Amino acid sequence: MINVMLADDHVLIREGIKQLLEFDGSMKVIAEASDGIECLEKLKNVKPDILLLDINMPNMNGIDVLKELKEKNDPLKVLILTVHSEVEYLVKAVDIGANGYILKDSGSTELKQAINAVIDEGSYI
């Protein structure tokens, strides 16, 4: 089973992604965060296999979360959740060290393929 942490400021998006991931029992969302600060705090106590990270969040955005993780040499794999209008941030996130990205409106098959690719191969770009 793949343990996932989900960081997104929209509760409905988190709930939808959680349902998609947990439907067949192959993945489990073990922690959720609504902003970057909460994400970093929760990561002190949970060890997911992968972090699904939104870019645009209040208090601390996903880019800053990613920077902090990489500065600490954290080996956590990170898959960026994005919308079409965030291309410039997406490029920056990959340059900083994100393992890949996926559009928020992707279906469950594509989302699971992206997560599995990051876990198994180290990237989904």
Regions found by a protein language model. Give the residues of each.
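Active-site residues of response regulator receiver
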Residues: D8, D54, T82
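C-terminal output helix
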Residues: E86, S106-I119, S123
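The feature encodes the CheY-like receiver
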Residues: I13, P58
